[in-house]
Swiss-Prot record:
Subunit structure, as described in the record: Homodimer.
Listed GO CC annotations: cytoplasm
Pfam families, per database record: PdxA (PF04166)
Functional summary from the UniProt entry: Catalyzes the NAD(P)-dependent oxidation of 4-(phosphooxy)-L-threonine (HTP) into 2-amino-3-oxo-4-(phosphooxy)butyric acid which spontaneously decarboxylates to form 3-amino-2-oxopropyl phosphate (AHAP).
Cofactors, names only: Zn(2+); Mg(2+); Co(2+)
Species of provenance: Helicobacter pylori (strain J99 / ATCC 700824) (Campylobacter pylori J99)
Positions with a binding annotation for substrate: 126-127, 259, 268, 277
Listed name of the protein: 4-hydroxythreonine-4-phosphate dehydrogenase
Pathway assigned in UniProt: Cofactor biosynthesis; pyridoxine 5'-phosphate biosynthesis; pyridoxine 5'-phosphate from D-erythrose 4-phosphate: step 4/5
Primary localization: cytoplasm
Other remarks on this protein: The active site is located at the dimer interface.
Catalytic activity: 4-(phosphooxy)-L-threonine + NAD(+) = 3-amino-2-oxopropyl phosphate + CO2 + NADH
Similarity-based family: Belongs to the PdxA family.
């Protein structure tokens, strides 16, 4: 069977993205046919910063339509407008290749959201861009590994805005889309307020969540969704024995326990997108950039998911 062709966007070159590409190429190329969306000159510069520890000539790198950012000992680990613009163009090119079926999927290495903002990129991050590009699809950010998956009802929005987003109709649409994509038989849904609202004592959001769960289960014809569960105990060991699938109303409530348990191996997946996309479950790691310290387990797991 032919290996799948996977486009790999470089992420922010001032972080660990290029190190991950270089140090993982042998293992990645055993899993798929990687297509790196980055100028070969940047890979060579990255290798020099890494004491020429890796082979660069065998990598299939495609120059993207963007000016080369500076990459040297003075720029690494710092927010750069040029690097933000470059990482966006690399990502956009990956999507274009997937849309045209020139690749089977895309793997996105971590970007810096502030660098995107400084480069006047009108999207908060990868998922926000995908939601705008594929508006007819209910795209869901799910992070995890085989032991635990968390779907986020809201992702990169201020916590103060989440309450207004929790509406029965929107949540039913989300829950049904999540179940359809994952084919999960049981999904535990975290509550929003302390003690999942204590029957309305702490806000009305959890009553809406309960109603959405009931309507979703009725539509499915079986009791798929459980909850809302008090979020402070939802990820206890006895709860995780029930199912690996969870839904969280907000970003940190779901991802704090996931990353505490499985940070190195988890990945980020875009459910319901018309293209196959996975990413690492970590950021640019500016603090260890070009120190040969980057853990590539999450990156390899993302490639395995796509391949």
């Amino acid at each position: 069977m032919a290996k799948k062709k996977i486009a790999i966007s470089c992420g922010d070159i001032q972080g660990v993205g290029l190190e991950l590409i270089l140090k993982s190429h042998k293992e990645v190329s055993a899993l798929c046919e990687p297509l790196y969306l980055v100028h070969s000159e940047l890979l060579e510069r990255a290798n020099q910063l890494l004491d020429n520890a890796y082979e660069t000539k065998t990598l299939n790198a495609i120059a993207i339509d963007a000016p080369l950012p500076l990459l040297n000992s003075s720029t690494i680990g710092k927010v750069s407008t040029q690097s933000g613009a470059y990482s966006f163009e690399s990502f956009k090119k990956a999507c274009e290749l997937a849309d045209s079926k020139e690749v089977d999927g895309i793997c996105t290495l971590p970007i810096n959201k502030l660098a995107w903002q400084q480069a006047q990129i009108p999207f908060v991050g990868h998922t926000d861009f995908l939601k705008q590009r594929y508006k007819d699809h209910q795209i869901i950010m799910m992070l995890g590994c085989s032991k635990l998956f968390v779907g986020l009802f809201s992702d990169h929005v201020p916590l103060s805005a989440v309450s207004q987003l929790i509406q029965v109709k929107a949540l039913v649409k989300f829950l049904l889309a999540f179940q359809k994509s994952t084919q999960a038989k049981i999904v535990q849904v975290c509550g929003f307020n302390p003690h999942a609202g204590e029957e309305g004592l702490f806000g009305e959001e959890d009553e809406k969540i309960l109603k959405a769960i009931q309507e979703s289960n009725q539509t499915l014809g079986f009791e798929c969704f459980l909850g809302p569960l008090p979020a402070d105990s939802a990820f206890a060991p006895n709860k995780r024995k029930i199912t690996p699938f969870y839904v969280s109303m907000s970003h940190d409530v779901g991802l704090a326990p996931l990353k505490a348990l499985y940070f190195d191996e988890s990945i980020n997946v875009s459910l319901n997108a018309p293209i196959l996309r996975a990413s690492t479950d970590h950021g640019t790691a500016f603090d260890i950039a070009y120190q040969n310290k980057a853990n590539h387990k999450s990156y390899l797991n993302a490639i395995k998911y796509l391949a």
